[in-house]
């Protein structure tokens, strides 16, 4: 039990490290800025899509009210009034204005995809028709799914009102769970569809459930803060709602992006437990696998490296690829696969270690054994090198900095 608890703590630390490394707070700030401009266009698109179906006619405002009541703290009531006014005015725009609103909505989706691809270490985002179809599906199917879910909620409510609480046992509990269910569905769809990478549905669902629960908890705590510490009203006065709403949007995106980090790393949850080897040693191991596959005329992906015994997490693999690609060792051949494109016979180990951005491993950090044919010779050479360094530089600083030794020769 204690071991599982310690593993959970270590995994949480790993996720926090990845959250910062992936620049998620910066992405959340960018998404907050984009959301300010895109929230009205997104609502306008939602109303337009719902108005195309007679059964959903007039349901847009009810959905908007439902969203603000269940997904925004109580401080958002004034913002809701303003947004309803802006959205009503936006419906009377000319076709030029409509195009501008559509572009703004697409810009928000581009920013979301960019943030997710940063977390999933995706080097090449979607392009062309594939990107357009994904965004159009989100903008069109999203409101329709919301409308369908809201219609089911309305039906359950009316059934209870007309035939009494016994008409549908558990209806009240079901209605109370509707906001959480909508959140889980929305986050699951977001995590599975937006990244330009393969995301297992099971992991997306787990991340959606985690994010939805965290979102509900944050909403409750944020509402308590607003009600118990109203000092911001003394500072901002009539404009107090604006900074509070901005802060809530930022916190919401932080939660969404942390959920994305969780989903991304669920597939590598076993790899973070391993004791990391010094990067130069890992680099040599990766080059050895690249060289072997080159001899067979085969390309390489991370899964091939795992099969060869090097269980690297994806972020470390991407970090090594960045260096190897910069030094023109490897080239991408499509489909996320890589090939060795340099003759290793013309490149010395000394040159590689000098170009390597990671420090040379100390004797204490060198693994005692490694299942690699090249490692014993490398280990022996490193021990001799460090012993020679200790012999040459073992004297005290006072000895080296003394004037009498300024012109002394090292022998």
From Swiss-Prot:
It is a multi-pass membrane protein. GO terms for cellular component: plasma membrane. Disulfide bonds: none annotated. The chain crosses the membrane at residues 36-56, 92-112, 132-152, 174-194, 207-229, 244-264. Keywords: Cell inner membrane, Cell membrane, Membrane, Transmembrane, Transmembrane helix. InterPro entries: UPF0761_bac, Virul_fac_BrkB. It is found in: Cell inner membrane. The keyword Cell wall biogenesis/degradation does not apply. The keyword Ribonucleoprotein does not apply. NCBIfam families: yihY_not_rbn. Belongs to the UPF0761 family. This is UPF0761 membrane protein PSPA7_4558.
């Amino acid at each position: 039990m204690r071991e599982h608890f310690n593993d959970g703590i270590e995994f949480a630390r790993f996720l926090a490290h990845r959250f910062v490394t992936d620049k998620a707070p910066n992405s959340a700030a960018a998404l907050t800025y984009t959301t300010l401009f895109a929230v009205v266009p997104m609502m306008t698109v939602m109303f337009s899509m719902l108005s195309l179906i007679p059964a959903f006619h007039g349901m847009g405002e009810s959905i908007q009210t439902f969203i603000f009541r269940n997904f925004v703290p109580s401080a958002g009531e004034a913002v809701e009034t303003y947004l309803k006014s802006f959205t009503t005015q936006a419906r009377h725009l000319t076709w030029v204005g409509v195009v501008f609103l559509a572009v703004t909505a697409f810009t928000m989706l581009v920013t979301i995809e960019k943030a997710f691809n940063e977390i999933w270490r995706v080097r090449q985002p979607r392009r062309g028709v594939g990107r357009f179809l994904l965004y159009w599906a989100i903008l069109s199917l999203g409101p329709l799914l919301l409308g369908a879910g809201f219609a089911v909620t309305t039906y359950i409510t009316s059934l209870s009102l007309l035939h009494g609480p016994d008409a549908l046992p558990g209806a009240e509990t079901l209605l109370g769970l509707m906001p959480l269910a909508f959140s889980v569905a929305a986050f699951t769809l977001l995590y599975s569809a937006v990244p330009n990478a393969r995301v297992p549905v099971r992991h997306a669902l787990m991340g959606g459930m985690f994010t939805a629960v965290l979102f509900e908890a944050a909403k409750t705590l944020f509402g308590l803060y607003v009600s118990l510490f109203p000092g911001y009203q003394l500072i901002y006065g009539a404009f107090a709602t604006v900074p509070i709403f901005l802060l809530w949007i930022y916190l919401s995106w932080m939660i969404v992006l942390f959920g994305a980090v969780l989903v991304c790393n669920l597939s590598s949850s076993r790899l973070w437990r391993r004791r990391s080897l010094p990067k130069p040693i890992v680099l040599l191991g990766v080059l050895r696998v690249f060289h072997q596959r080159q001899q067979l005329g085969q390309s390489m992906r991370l899964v091939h490296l795992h099969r060869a015994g090097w269980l690297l997490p994806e972020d470390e693999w991407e970090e090594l690829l960045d260096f190897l690609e910069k030094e023109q060792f490897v080239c991408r051949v499509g489909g996320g696969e890589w090939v060795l494109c340099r003759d290793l016979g013309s490149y010395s180990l000394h040159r590689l270690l000098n170009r390597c951005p990671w420090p040379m491993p100390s004797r204490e950090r060198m693994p005692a054994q490694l299942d690699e044919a090249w490692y014993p010779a490398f280990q022996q050479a490193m021990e001799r090198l460090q012993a020679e360094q200790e012999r040459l530089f073992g004297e005290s600083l006072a000895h080296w900095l003394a004037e009498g030794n300024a012109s002394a020769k090292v022998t």
